[in-house]
Swiss-Prot record:
Its main location: secreted. Keywords: Copper, Glycoprotein, Metal-binding, Nickel, Secreted. Binds copper, nickel, and fatty acids as well as, and bilirubin less well than, serum albumin. It comes from Bos indicus. This is Probable alpha-fetoprotein. It is found in: Secreted. The lineage of its organism: Eukaryota, Metazoa, Chordata, Craniata, Vertebrata.
Amino acid sequence: DKNAYGIDLIL
């Protein structure tokens, strides 16, 4: 998944 900045966030 990508956030609004085009960065994939996996926490």
